[in-house]
Structures are given as C-alpha cells and as structure tokens.
Amino acid sequence: MGEVVNLKAATRGGSGSRTRPISKRSAPARTSKRRGSRRDKTALVLGGGGFTGGVYEIGALRALDLLAANRTINQFDVYVGTSAGAFVASLCANGVTPEEMMRVVTHQGPQAFRDIDLGDLLRLNLPELARTGVRLPLRVASLARQLLPQLGQVSLIDILLGLAEVLPSGAYTGQGIERYLRRVLEEDGRHDDFRALEHELYLVATDLDSCERIVFGADGFDDVPISTAVRASGALPMVYAPVKVGDRELIDGGIVSTTNLDIAIEAGADLVIVINPIVPFVNDRSEPGRNGRPARRISDMGFSKIGYQAFKLLGHRRLHELASMWEERYPGVDIVLIEPEPTDALMFETSIMSFSSRIEIARHGFQSVTYHLLDEYERYSEIWARHGIEISERRVRSVVDHFEAEEEQVGAWRKILEGTTGALLRQSGSAG
C-alpha cells in the first residue's frame, strides 16, 4: 500500500485506450517545471470495488483529512471517479466531507442528507424479470428443438448459454442510486451538473457496443447529470443493467481501468492521490486465517471468489504496469497509490455488495491507511510538501491514541469516523 510513483518524462498523452479526450481547458500546458511558480494542481482519484470498496474509500479519506493540516479532501482541483468511486467522488466534489458521508452510511445524526439503504442500492430489475418469465418457456422449447438433433454433442454450457439470451441484462436497475443521488445533489447548494461545480469532476463508464471509455465531465459529456453518470459508471455487468445515455449503452468504467488515473494526469495534475480498493489477495496458507480459522484455498471459497481474484489480479497488474510506464514519460508528477495490503483477508472475504459490513470496512479503511501513513510519514511529508500540502503526524497520533484508550472500541472508532476534525482535535487535546 502507498506506492509513490514519480513521473519523469516530458510529454502528456493518452493511455492507449480508446477514450473521449479531456477538454483543453482541463489540461493546461505546463509553462514551468519550477516548484512555487504557481499553485500545484492536485487530483484525487477513487477506484471501484462495489459498496465495500466505496466505504473503504470513505474511511481512507477520513484518515487523509485528519493527516493534512492545511488542506481537506474537498479542496482538490480534480476528482476522478470510477464505479463505486464515482459515487464518492461526486460527493467530494460537491463539498461533502468524509464524516458527513459516514453519518449517512451508519444512519447516525446529525446528517447532511438522508440515509442510504438497500432499497436505494439494490432495486430489482422487475420489467426484465417479468419479460424473462414470459419468454423463458418459449426459449426452452426453441432450444430443445435446436439441440435435440445434436444430442450427445451438447454440453451443459451450450444449454446455459442458449438460455442466457432471455435472461435479464442485470439483476438490478441502478435507478435507486441515480434517484437518491439526484435528490442529494439538488439540495443545500450542491450540484447535479458538472458545469456548475467549482472543481473538475470526471466520472468514467464503458460503452458496451463500441468498447470506448466515456469520460463524463469532459467536453461532449458534461451535459449529462452527475447522478446519471454515477449510475452508468457503477453498472457492474450482470449485477446492474446497462445504462442508456443517448444512443449508447454504458457499463462499469472499471472494465477499462479500475482507477483511470491517467485522466488526472491529462487534466494537468502535479500531485495525484489514488485510492484503489481492488487488490488481489495473496493467500498465505502457512498462516492462520482471519479470526484464527484454518487457512483455506481460494477455490474453496466458491466460483465468485475465483472470478473476483482473477479480475483483481488483471486490474491491479495493469495499474502498476502503467504507473511504471508513466514514470518514464511525464516530468515532475507524483502519484501516491493508497491500497489495502495484499494479505488483507477482510477486504477479500467481504462481499463487494455487503451493506451490513459497512461500519467494519470503514473502520478498517481508516485504521489501515492511518497506520500506513504514520509508518511512512517522512516519505509522504516530503512528497506532499513539494505541492504545498502540510501533513501532521502529531494530529493523527494524538487523536488515535486518545480514542484507542476508550474501553468501548466500536464506539470510539465511530467517533473518529463520524466526528468533525475540529471536534476530534479538541477532544484529544491537540487543537491549535
């Protein structure tokens, strides 16, 4: 976790994928490489990972907010969000703080806006389910006529694939997420319009037919409501139905890249902080499993874990390979990658759509990122100072030490996650 990549070569360009370009207004030419000639441009990039990944990001952002003495996570110049990260990024760009997000997720007041619940996240795709009920018997009869002459040469896979054409395009519609976010962003000075934001916001989806990466917020795609873009960016195949925007059908932006951090570089960022919850699990079977249980093979955890491990491995390897490539390409840009450890069993074993684990995952995100940032404090302090950001080890240590001394640990960690930074510093005696 926390790899720092210093990009050194001279030209800015695309990542090689078919992508709608960022507008020129969002990618100013670099006129000077000398620090201090202007305020450095900063970017926050939030990757995917389902509901679990999004809550992990909120916990990690709470840690970053507490660490930085002269900057908050709502003061980045550029925000890039993919999948679950699109939801969180849209709130960050609208001035919603990590503690406000946590109070909504945990259903604790006072809240900046109403709670989010399972009904918002998982709204069944009833129209397509109903059509399936009507069409499935007809498809079974048609398939039987087609395959009976080939009996003995037909596999179970052939049958399942033959039936798949009449199944829903996704179990859920994603409409609940879009409606919830639209209501939130239309209240209290927030905006559901990319063009009305003070900061640059880019949300990424994938065109199912053309295979293009679609960057909402860039020229030509900045007139789409933010809430619609978030729904499209998080349309995980088979879980959520593709989202129609104009004449396009869009799916999860994480299919192209789990973070799409090159968008931040193209937008002119000098410091890019990436939170990437999607990390493959290094399963050391010589060590006991979580909670002291005997270690298991990943294959013993079911086909979904096998598939998820494979997806994580592909996405994570590509992210780090591209970071190495950019190291030789771009000058003077620092990228900080914040990720779970490869041995993080909790993040791997928890379902990406687990709503009931939200408090545990947020606390885990805060704890793991906080301790890592403290362990690597000198390195991060030097990097962030180059871009005018001051970080304070004393602030974090005093708050964590104060609340860890409390007997009721779940309540203590919730105070950290849900309390304002000012209140935490006053309670721990480190204000000022």
Model-derived regions: residue spans:
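Patatin-like phospholipase
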Residues: 2-82, 90-432
